[in-house]
Design a protein with these regions (language model features):
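N-terminal Rossmann-fold NAD(P) dinucleotide-binding loop
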Residues: 24
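Glycine-rich Rossmann-fold phosphate-binding loop(s) that bind the pyrophosphate
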Residues: 19-21, 43
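Extreme N-terminal leader/targeting segments of oxidoreductases
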Residues: 1-15, 33-34
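Helix-loop-beta segment of a Rossmann-like dinucleotide-binding subdomain
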Residues: 9-10, 89-98, 132-162
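Short beta-strand/turn micro-motifs at beta-sheet edges
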Residues: 43-48, 86, 133-137
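Glycine-rich FAD pyrophosphate-binding loop
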Residues: 32-52
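Dinucleotide-binding Rossmann-like beta1-alpha1 core, especially the glycine-rich loop
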Residues: 56-134
Length: 162
């Protein structure tokens, strides 16, 4: 059995957050920023489980329309988070590309764009040459794709502990 160091928890707090992954850590951060006394509990080290293995995509593209308002705001936050935290999160706003393997999938992608265009996300429909232009040296199988340049990615093992 592992011997963990003994810690002294505060006698009082406003909120207890259980789990030190990206959601728990960010919840604790913003609650603290709002003036709450927060205790963050994690059974291991921060970002040592699912958040530490995730790819770190912050994407609007392909989301359920119900999720989009939240993801649009999250994307805005991520764009300035390194500066706010004074930390290197390896944030890259390089976009997200979905490649359609067949006409049916391409039609589904185009349907998503049509269903979500009122949100103002700048998703581009690409033919195979457009996909290849975004991925130099890689011949993309398929009939095209969609690309959202405002989507990005951060390094989860750096973001959660920050």
């Amino acid at each position: 059995m592992t011997n963990y160091p003994k810690i002294t928890l505060p006698k009082e707090c406003d909120v207890v957050v259980i789990g030190g992954g990206i959601h728990g850590s960010s919840s604790a951060y913003y609650l603290t920023k709002a003036g709450m006394k927060v205790v963050l509990l994690e059974k291991d080290t921060i970002a040592s489980h699912q958040s530490g293995r995730a790819w770190g995509f912050v994407r609007q593209q392909g989301r359920d329309p119900v999720e989009l308002p939240l993801m649009i705001e999250c994307n805005k936050i991520w764009q300035g988070l390194e500066k706010e935290l004074n930390a290197d999160l390896e944030w890259r706003q390089g976009g997200v590309l979905f490649v359609a393997r067949d006409d049916k999938e391409m039609s589904e992608f185009e349907g998503w764009i049509n269903d979500t265009k009122h949100f103002g996300i700048e998703t581009q429909v690409l033919d195979p040459k457009g996909v290849e232009k975004l991925t130099p040296g890689i011949t993309a199988p398929g009939v095209g794709g969609i690309y959202t340049p405002s989507d990005g990615q951060a390094e989860p093992k750096k973001a959660a502990p920050a």
